[in-house]
């Protein structure tokens, strides 16, 4: 690790910094055998990048086959041996994803209204109640 010049800082009256007693050789890992630790982004950076990525895109985010299995499983409760056109399943998936995106937008607004940045189940419940979906 390269040494950098320290800039003077105004004292805030706390404890004085401890003196470094370890020698330079003991502190530094050997240049040839040192293992470089992987680069990590600061918390939130990757999340914001993902938000921008998914807001730009229009592709479906739920995998097609698991969604199709879910649709068939739910349809079994109403009538057995139902068949679906592939376009019908895609239309259902498009509608389901649009509904979920809208619900999460409203949920986020509920969390922000409560002066939080983390969404919670109570935010989803409030959003659905305001929408009139759940009395």
UniProtKB/Swiss-Prot annotation:
- Phosphothreonine PTM positions read 12
* SMART domains tied to this protein: H3 (SM00428)
GO terms under cellular component: nucleosome; nucleus
Which compartment or compartments is the protein found in?
Nucleus; Chromosome
Q: How is it modified after translation?
A: Acetylation is generally linked to gene activation. Acetylated to form H3K9ac (11%), H3K14ac (17%), H3K18ac (11%), H3K23ac (16%) and H3K27ac (7%). H3K4, H3K35 and H3K36 are not acetylated. H3K4me prevents acetylation. 32% of the histone H3 are acetylated with, on average, 2.4 acetyl-Lys. They are all continuously deacatylated and re-acetylated with a half-life of approximately 2 minutes.
Q: Which residues carry this modification: Phosphoserine?
A: 11
Pfam families this protein is in?
Histone
What PROSITE patterns would the database entry show?
HISTONE_H3_1, HISTONE_H3_2
Q: Which residues carry this modification: N6-acetyllysine?
A: 10, 15, 19, 24, 28
Which residue positions does UniProt flag as site: Not N6-acetylated? 5, 36-37
Q: Where is this site: Not N6-methylated?
A: 15, 19, 24
Ranges annotated as spanning the membrane: none
Say where the protein is mainly found: nucleus
Give UniProt keywords alphabetically.
Acetylation, Chromosome, DNA-binding, Methylation, Nucleosome core, Nucleus, Phosphoprotein
Highest rank taxon of the organism: Eukaryota
Q: Which residues get modified to N6-methyllysine?
A: 5, 10, 28, 36-37
Among InterPro entries, the record links this protein to:
Histone-fold, Histone_H2A/H2B/H3, Histone_H3/CENP-A
Region of interest: Disordered:
1-40
Function per UniProt: Core component of nucleosome. Nucleosomes wrap and compact DNA into chromatin, limiting DNA accessibility to the cellular machineries which require DNA as a template. Histones thereby play a central role in transcription regulation, DNA repair, DNA replication and chromosomal stability. DNA accessibility is regulated via a complex set of post-translational modifications of histones, also called histone code, and nucleosome remodeling.
The record's PANTHER family line, in alphabetical order, gives: HISTONE H3
Instruction: Tell me its family.
Output: Belongs to the histone H3 family.
Assembly mode: The nucleosome is a histone octamer containing two molecules each of H2A, H2B, H3 and H4 assembled in one H3-H4 heterotetramer and two H2A-H2B heterodimers. The octamer wraps approximately 147 bp of DNA.
**The protein's name in its UniProt record:** Histone H3 type 2
Q: Which organism is it from?
A: Chlamydomonas reinhardtii
